[in-house]
Amino acid sequence: MSLPWWRARFDLTLHEAKQDPNARIVWLGDSITEYWQRQGGHGYDDVLPVWQRDYAPYHALDFGFIGDTTSSLIWRLDHGEVAGLHPRLAIVLIGANNFGATHWGAAVTVPGIEAVVTDTQRHLPHAHILLLGVLPSIRSAWITAQTAATNAALARVYAHNPAVTFMNVGPVLERDGHADAALYVDPHLTPPEPALHPDAEGMARIAAAIAPVVRKYAGAP
């Protein structure tokens, strides 16, 4: 929490929350969520137009942070990030970084995500929670296995919870049951990196997949 850029972004989110207290949707997550604001100029990485089309009409707030784990997100929630907000819908997408440098598997990540959901409910008691499963990536066989185990467990945990909708949107990013590298930004980088962050088409597919739930709980734009 002491990295200058991280602290600067946290301060920015606090400011944004005060500037737009009537936001009807709040996105909470890591770099994948932060990528909603990406406008790289190459087409495949121009994600911002999707956000402007699907979420800006809701005065949605994007609280995604590069590198954040479940623990980091809980810290943000507990230090005032959503204070004063009363959204109808909170969309949570977290967990990918648990499998990275920290090497936390499903056994740690599932309760971590459950803690994020509980904390979000505590700070945003009137918001419905749309919990997205950890997205597929092409990083390692171990991460792929942990992703599948995490999503299966979360589906069971929230199967009958009226306050939480769990959705595994991973299949919209897959081809033949595996992450489709053609739908990710990372392979386009120089040098190429393993597929982790969906590109503009991938994010548009996610937005389309969750649109019925967004309309159900956040209403019409």
Locate each region found by the language model.
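Serine-esterase "nucleophile elbow" of acetyl-processing enzymes
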Residues: 1-66, 71-86
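Structural recognition of the beta-strand scaffold that forms the well-ordered cores
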Residues: 24-29, 59-64, 88-94, 128-133, ...
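Glycine-rich anion/phosphate-binding loops
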Residues: 67-75, 104-113
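A structural signal for short coil/turn segments at secondary-structure junctions
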Residues: 20, 55, 124, 161-162
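Surface-exposed acidic, glycine-flexible loop patches that form ligand/cofactor-binding
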Residues: 79-86, 120-123, 215-219
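Generic structural signal for well-ordered alpha-helices
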Residues: 113-118, 151-155
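Surface-exposed cleft-lining segments at the edges of enzyme active sites
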Residues: 62-65, 95-109, 137-143
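Catalytic His-Asp segment of secreted/periplasmic serine-dependent ester chemistry enzymes
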Residues: 138-221
